[in-house]
Amino acid sequence: PKPKKKQRWTPLEISLEVLVLVLVXI
């Protein structure tokens, strides 16, 4: 995992997280 300095969530990161969850879920 990459070390995160800032806890700021970008829309792209959220989209990637959701996409991964959906793919795993399938």
Swiss-Prot record:
Binds 1 zinc ion per subunit. Its EC number is 3.4.24.11. Transmembrane segments: none annotated. Coiled coil: none annotated. Keywords: Cell membrane, Hydrolase, Membrane, Metalloprotease, Protease, Transmembrane, Zinc. Its main location: membrane. It is a single-pass type II membrane protein. GO terms for cellular component: plasma membrane. It comes from the Eukaryota. It is found in: Cell membrane. One of its GO terms (biological process) is proteolysis. Its cofactor is Zn(2+). GO terms for molecular function: metalloendopeptidase activity. It catalyses: Preferential cleavage of polypeptides between hydrophobic residues, particularly with Phe or Tyr at P1'; substance P + H2O = substance P(1-9) + L-Leu-L-Met-NH2; substance P + H2O = substance P(1-7) + L-Phe-Gly-L-Leu-L-Met-NH2; neurotensin + H2O = neurotensin(1-11) + L-isoleucyl-L-leucine. It is an enzyme of class 3 (hydrolase). Belongs to the peptidase M13 family. Thermolysin-like specificity, but is almost confined on acting on polypeptides of up to 30 amino acids. Biologically important in the destruction of opioid peptides such as Met- and Leu-enkephalins by cleavage of a Gly-Phe bond. Catalyzes cleavage of bradykinin, substance P and neurotensin peptides. Able to cleave angiotensin-1, angiotensin-2 and angiotensin 1-9. Involved in the degradation of atrial natriuretic factor (ANF) and brain natriuretic factor (BNP(1-32)). Displays UV-inducible elastase activity toward skin preelastic and elastic fibers. This is Neprilysin. The gene is MME.
